A protein has these predicted regions:
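Acidic-histidine catalytic/liganding microenvironments
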Residues: 41, 92-93, 262, 275
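Glycine- (often His-adjacent) and acidic-residue-rich active-site loop
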Residues: 51-85, 104, 134-136
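Crotonase-fold acyl-CoA enzyme core
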Residues: 90-126, 130-219, 223
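Amphipathic alpha-helical segments at domain termini/boundaries
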Residues: 1-11, 15, 161-258, 266-286
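Terminal peptide-recognition signature
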Residues: 12, 16, 30-31, 49, ...
């Protein structure tokens, strides 16, 4: 992690280039420390969060960290702990702009959604995804709750259940990001942040209450994805929509723990660790 101050703005950069800035426990711990300091520092008016390099903002969570989980209770507790870092950014008391300098998968998108606003490098064909179902589990750092509240239930329903990526252009269309940037992304983020601080730009925050759910949600082609994981994912999304964001996040953590009791989470993680991210896991739907 790198932090530098530019006047009254903190620039926070996640730096793990060999793994496309994937988040491990050390990154979570440093994010907690850095953003706690930012919140307490009266001289800092806001923050920009970005990633090192040009290929990825954050490529997701370190899967080895998840493979070490032994029980549903342990998985739920880990989820709750990780969420506390994401919630810290959301509840910073100061605006934060995410400069999404490359793909934002899994926990990368979840960190971005906790920020006040999001900007992306222009023209990214593969930009944002919640690929967790490909590994046999649901998102665990807020996506099942924040994504529907940010882009609408129909868009989130398809993104979450299909696990397919969307482009930066599509992300702007559905309201996941504020804009695509052709030039210097961090400078554009600083400029937007200054406007938010000055009150000349207003960003609508993610709703904290229940959200409406259409009686007919889009059909989603699951392909070879686990039907067991999908049923748990639907449960987290739909139950969370009926309640507050805070309660929905607790539901997500609990359901993430339930994933650990399935055969398909073990199959998905084993396949990823042995064969890599492009391998299709032989799920048994249990």
């Amino acid at each position: 992690m790198i932090r530098e101050n530019k006047g009254d703005i903190a620039i926070v950069k996640i730096r793990r280039p060999k793994v496309l800035n994937a988040i491990n426990q050390d990154v979570f711990d440093q994010l907690r420390e850095i953003f706690t300091d930012i919140r307490k520092d009266p001289n800092i008016k806001g923050a920009v969060l970005t990633g090192f390099g040009t290929r990825a903002f954050v490529s997701g969570a370190d899967i080895g960290m998840l493979a070490a989980l032994k029980t549903p209770a342990e998985a739920e507790a880990k989820c709750t702990e990780d969420k506390s870092v994401v919630n810290l950014i959301e509840d910073l008391g100061k605006p934060a702009v995410c400069a999404m300098n490359g793909l934002a998968f899994g926990g990368g998108n979840e960190l971005a959604m906790a920020c006040t606003a999001r900007l992306a490098t222009q023209g990214q064909k593969v930009f944002v995804a919640q690929p967790e179902p490909r590994l046999g589990f649901i998102p665990g750092a807020g996506a099942t709750q924040r994504l529907p509240r940010l882009v609408g239930m129909e868009n989130a329903w398809t993104m979450l259940r299909s696990a397919n990526p969307i482009s930066s252009t599509r992300a702007k269309e559905i309201g996941l990001i504020q804009d695509e940037v052709k030039g210097d992304l961090v400078e554009a983020a600083i400029d937007l942040l200054k406007k938010i601080i000055a009150g000349s730009v207003s960003i609508t925050p993610i709703p904290k209450g229940p959200i409406p759910v259409s009686s007919k949600l889009p059909e989603v082609d699951l392909g070879s994805l686990s039907r067991k994981t999908d049923s748990l994912l639907q449960k987290a999304i739909l139950e969370g929509a009926k309640t507050t964001l805070a309660e929905g996040l607790k539901i997500e953590s609990k359901v993430f723990g339930e994933c650990l009791a399935t055969e398909d989470m073990k199959i998905g993680i084993d396949t990823f660790l042995k064969e890599g991210p492009k391998a299709s896991a032989p799920f048994v739907h249990k």
